[in-house]
Regions:
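Cytoplasmic/organellar membrane-interface segments at the starts of transmembrane helices
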Residues: 268, 396-400, 465-580, 591-593, ...
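Alpha-helical multi-pass transmembrane bundles of energy-transducing inner-membrane proteins
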Residues: 36-38, 128-135, 139-227, 231-232, ...
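Structural signature of hydrophobic alpha-helical transmembrane segments
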Residues: 11-22, 96-107, 149-162, 237-248, ...
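Juxtamembrane/interfacial segments at transmembrane-helix boundaries in multi-pass membrane proteins
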Residues: 64-91, 192-258, 288-306, 354, ...
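Membrane-interfacial loop-to-helix junctions in multi-pass inner-membrane proteins
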Residues: 36-52, 121-135, 150-153, 171-192, ...
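Alpha-helical transmembrane segments of multipass membrane proteins
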Residues: 27-32, 57, 112-116, 138-142, ...
Length: 608
């Protein structure tokens, strides 16, 4: 109790700094303890991740109870001058708000999961592994807490370094190729994104006379002095949008910029896959919400139909490729491509309900995908294969592993009552709403086709996931072929041999160890919690989501009206004019659903 009172007396800004500093300190401690052996290193990493999670969770609770949460304002802001004087007003700033709060907490949660799933899987060079894992945690927390462009970019770039080495050193047979491909793709995109952000900074300085990297100041500045979106201005806003798109689309990844992801997932160690799927893919969507949509609304509106379509393509493409996979981990990797397509589609529907669903689905996918990747790693540790054809009957040998895998599978396919259903439902509802009443008649059919394809993706997702579950867990029991000739810590199939044979009982059971249950149980709790009380998780970001997307949504609606005004008039259109009114899209009446017991959560549905 005294400890909690002490944390409550700590200023929120100090509390935030403590959360981010803890994994950095823990990385140093793990390095120092390296001489004491594997047990000391992994225990120190687990304690560090647990302390970070506790502090992050407490900070999230403090935010939810703060007046800033209700007002949609920044919380726990810590700022220090870096370059102040003359025309420069550059301050390094950290803070949390509705856009970042859940992703911040998710980063801390999945970092503990990543440490625990690596408990017996990593035996070669454990000091370097756990140091890099903790550095990656600090970088992920920093990305979502950064309130200025410089810190955001530093943390954004720094996430690449630990993951590059985690894949390249502790990965599987093609680990080096996967690491290099991952690094080149993401580094190229992030450099272009930084050039785009720097252009925004310079544009703002040319109008205000002050060079600032503060994100809130840049958002206000671009609202007062928008970047030109016309030929006279060189289409500067669209050029900057494309530069940011290059960095964020690769990070998501949006098809066709996804080719690095399946290879990186398959070759990464389990802990790396947990962080990659659970958190790092979300940074791209966060970047769109934090920078592209509020600072470049006209370009966002112009690109929205194309990105809505790319989201639909990603849904179907990822699902179809997942259907033909024979490697369980690769199947889940392509399912991530499909699920991120839903998030992209919901975000660029520019409809309140869809955007709220997309934001919630960031958390949902982080939980379910991280859980599935963690469990696939546990399966490999026991059976030394990920081949679906060589697995079967696991339910009789590892019933708790089966229960958790089925729970995360049902979450992934959107079973009602679980978290995945809520996010997908809101995305689909908002997408159909946009397609039916929110676009010009010329675009209505393409939008409806894309929305219907998203529904087809739900069916395909259930197909490939349930197909895999049936064969791996309930098919005939098969003994996977044992491979001889392990070299350089990898077996003949290229799978890491850093793991162990899980002890089996006299009946052949090889169920989860305590640390494996501890790794996935918190994720399962949140899967159920969000599914049963979604309003609890929809309320905190609602105000910030409206603020972040308002300008882009307004610009998109204006573009739709302009497109309809320029459409050729037909006799049928004259009839429609009498019913609808002057050739414009149907006037949109709105009604609000207020979720109880959280009246702050409003889902606004429009109707003709």
């Amino acid at each position: 109790m005294n400890g909690m009172n002490g944390m409550n007396s700590m200023t929120p800004a100090t509390h935030l700094l403590l959360v981010i500093a803890t994994p950095l300190i823990g990385a140093v401690v793990a390095w120092v303890l390296g001489s004491r052996g594997l047990s000391a290193v992994r225990q120190s990493a687990a304690v560090t991740a647990l302390i970070t999670l506790f502090n992050a969770g407490w900070l999230v609770l403090r935010y939810l109870q703060s007046p800033e949460a209700a007002a949609g304002e920044p919380y726990a802001v810590a700022s220090a001058p870096w370059l102040v004087g003359g025309i420069f007003d550059v301050r390094l700033s950290l803070g949390l708000d509705g856009l970042s709060i859940w992703l911040f907490g998710l980063s801390a949660l999945l970092s503990l999961t990543a440490v625990l799933v690596s408990w017996n899987a990593i035996r070669e060079k454990p000091v370097g592994f756990y140091v890099l894992l903790l550095l990656l945690e600090a970088a992920m927390l920093g990305v979502f807490a950064a309130r200025d462009v410089i810190l955001f970019y530093v943390f954004f770039e720094f996430t690449l370094v630990p993951l590059f080495f985690l894949i390249g050193i502790w990965g599987h047979e093609e680990r080096r190729r996967a690491a290099v491909k991952f690094f080149i793709y993401t580094l190229t995109g992030s450099v272009l994104a930084f050039l785009g952000l720097l252009t925004i900074v310079l544009w703002n300085a040319s109008h205000t006379g002050t060079v600032t990297f503060d994100i809130a100041s840049l958002t206000a500045g671009t609202a007062a002095h928008p970047l030109p979106m016309n030929a006279e201005g060189g289409w500067l806003q669209m050029i900057v949008f494309l530069a940011l798109f290059a960095g964020f689309a690769v990070k998501v990844p949006i098809v066709p910029f996804h080719t690095w992801l399946p290879l990186a997932h398959v070759e990464a160690p389990t802990g790396g896959s947990v962080d990659l799927a659970g958190v790092l893919l979300k940074i791209g969507i966060y970047g769109f919400l934090r920078f592209s949509m509020p600072m470049l609304p006209d370009a966002t509106a112009a690109a929205a139909p194309w990105l809505f379509g790319l989201g639909a393509v990603g849904i179907i493409y990822g699902a179809l490729v997942a259907l033909v996979q024979t490697d369980l981990k690769r199947l889940i990797a392509y399912s991530s491509v499909s699920h991120m397509g839903y998030i992209v589609m919901g975000l660029f529907a520019l409809e309140t309900v869809a955007v709220q669903g997309a934001n919630l689905q960031l958390i949902n996918h982080g939980l379910s995908a991280a859980g599935l990747f963690a469990l696939v790693g546990m399966i490999y540790e026991r059976f030394h294969t990920r081949s679906i054809a060589n697995l079967g009957g696991i339910a009789t040998k590892a019933p708790w592993l089966t229960v958790f895998f089925m729970l995360f599978t049902f979450s992934s396919i959107g079973l009602p009552g679980l978290n995945g259903f809520v996010g997908e439902f809101l995305i689909l509802a908002g997408s159909f709403q946009r397609a039916w009443t929110g676009v010009a008649p010329a675009l209505r059919t393409p939008y409806l086709v894309m929305a219907v394809s998203a529904v087809a993706g739900v069916v395909l997702g259930a197909w490939y996931m349930l197909w895999a579950v049936e064969r791996v867990f309930f098919g005939g029991s098969r003994e996977p072929p044992r491979q001889a000739g392990v070299t350089h810590g990898h077996d003949a199939h290229g799978y890491s041999a850093h793991g162990h044979d899980a002890p089996a009982g006299h009946d052949g059971r090889c169920d989860l160890e305590w640390y494996e249950v501890a790794a996935v149980l918190p994720l399962a709790v949140f899967v159920l919690w969000i599914g049963l009380t979604p309003a609890t998780f929809l309320a905190p970001p609602a105000a910030m989501l409206r603020a972040a997307t308002r300008a882009a949504t307004t610009a998109f609606d204006a573009q739709m009206r302009d497109l309809d005004d320029r459409a050729p008039t037909t006799p049928a259109a004259h009839v429609a004019d009498r019913v609808v009114g002057h050739g414009h899209p149907a006037p949109r009446q709105s009604f609000t659903l207020t979720s109880k017991p959280n009246p702050d959560t409003e889902l606004t549905l429009d109707r003709p």
